[in-house]
Amino acid sequence: MKKKSFCLNFRANKKKKNFVLSKKNIFGKTQKFKICVPFFTYTENKINTHISPFDSFSCLFASQSIESLQNQKFSKYSLQKYQRSNQDTLIVQRPMVREGDWVQSGDLLADCASSLGGELCLGKNIFIAYMPWEGYNYEDAILISQRLVTEDVYTSVHIESYEVETKNTKLGKEQITNKIPDIPEKEKNHLDERGIVKLGTFVHEGQILVGKVTPIQKKYRSGYEKLLYTILEKELIPMRDSSLRTPKGLKAKVVEIKILNFSWNFAPTEKTLPSPIQQKKKNSKILLKKQRKPERVQVYLAEKRKIQVGDKMAGRHGNKGIVSKILPIQDMPFLPDGTPLDMVLNPLGVPSRMNVGQIYECLLGLASKYLNHYYRIQAFDEIYGPHASRSFTFAKLYEARLKTNQKWLFNPCYPGKMQIFDGQTGEPYDSPVTVGIAYMLKLVHLVDDKIHARSTGPYSLVTQQPLRGRSKYGGQRLGEMEVWAIEAYGAAFILLEMLTIKSDDISGRMTLWSNILLNMPIYIGTPESFKVLICELQALCLDMGLFQLNKKGFLTQIEHLMQLP
């Protein structure tokens, strides 16, 4: 072998025949050696070779260098896809590099759902105007265009988890199965053999997600019923349907299913213990994986939510508000070039809060739209002068006017404002309006998660008042200041209902329904909170006496709280 050669021209003697090593010979199954130009090091073959001591010494160091390259660690990053965040939003990561790209420390490898090019990107740049519009943006309300809904500008994906768990009852254990009584087969087509919804299924309101049955007490069945079940070839299963179903008003897709098993079935076998102690095989047990049954199932549903009336939006300057109305595109105010606006904000939300930066943002955004430029303004730029922001913004608007020949972009008489037109009548508005492009965000406070109604629900054990909170199916709290407001209006009977039969008057709310049906006067009892207060004062060793008027008009003392009406 030539020491400085870069070609594979080495000849070896194998079975008394000479052959030339090619690429196939090197990487084949017969010959295994490590290559380092210009050295060859043999590791697992038995070829008779004659290598000089100098070449052997050089090959040793070359082999060590190759092994050091082979032992290098490779960093592996697993990207998340369609995962759920703590706010029930979507977590998805998309790679920004391809195989073979050279990267170094600090380079961007992947983007998430809320970033673009490694920068935070949570909202959209849209056309806005600061003007009142028929009272629909009163008190920080927001008027938006139908374009934001149809083009999915603010459509978000939310993932919610629903869980079902089997419990042990007095009559037996609950089971997760697809054999649900009194459910037709067409309503179970989307379930697998275990009774769990298939991955990727689109589900709607009331559809079964996880089939579960609960044992019930066996009822006496007459001979006619038994004959009927025999004719229909149905079994008398003492089970009731307790399946997990899709919540009301939800249309979503199943994106993930987690099955948790806590109980295992055991069975003895001869292979469990070694031969010297086979006599104890009756006490040995082995896990049978095929007989595992799910005890807890978590189903993750992904839902698309378009922006709607009641959703909360905000800008980058704390200018938040609630969507009050969605107007058709043709009814929105439009610019002199015919561009319809996307959003109308209330101008009264600017001076009182002193966040004038939103005005500079929307005007500079308008200039950047027509100049096709991108501006990055650092905070506290007034260090360059008292009017640095205003001067820079007006200069860019004037530059956009000169380059595009759109004179309405900058008017020296009222800089930063322009004449726009009513979309419903086509007539221009009386006064010029501030119009621009601002960065607006959709917040996680959605109306679907806020809206709630209650008729009759759970009550607290101590105070006997309705529970609070939407998750507990609670009621609306009537606090101290709300009571003052009702008192100020003089609504005495509404206040009486709120504090008694709608709250913690046990006897009153039990007789309310029957009294209404029988056209009888509504009975008002004593609130339970008053009784709790008396008991707490008596626990402090205070003698609290309760008196009531008898039929003769005299006061008589009530000996016990249970005697209160």
From Swiss-Prot:
Molecular function per GO: DNA binding; DNA-directed RNA polymerase activity; ribonucleoside binding
E.C. designation(s): 2.7.7.6
Major enzyme class: transferase
Localization terms from the record: Plastid, Chloroplast
CDD domains (UniProt xref): RNA_pol_B_RPB2
Superkingdom of source: Eukaryota
InterPro entries per UniProt: DNA-dir_RNA_pol_su2, DNA-dir_RNAP_su2_dom, DNA-dir_RNAP_su2_hyb_sf, RNA_pol_bsu_CS, RNA_pol_Rpb2_7, RNA_pol_RPB2_OB-fold
GO cellular component: chloroplast; DNA-directed RNA polymerase complex; mitochondrion
This protein's record includes keyword Chloroplast: yes
Protein's GO biological process: DNA-templated transcription
Assembly with partners or alone: In plastids the minimal PEP RNA polymerase catalytic core is composed of four subunits: alpha, beta, beta', and beta''. When a (nuclear-encoded) sigma factor is associated with the core the holoenzyme is formed, which can initiate transcription.
Additional remark text: In S.obliquus the gene for this protein is split in two.
Function: DNA-dependent RNA polymerase catalyzes the transcription of DNA into RNA using the four ribonucleoside triphosphates as substrates.
Family: Belongs to the RNA polymerase beta chain family.
Name listed for the protein in its UniProt record: DNA-directed RNA polymerase subunit beta C-terminal section
Gene, per the UniProt record: rpoB2
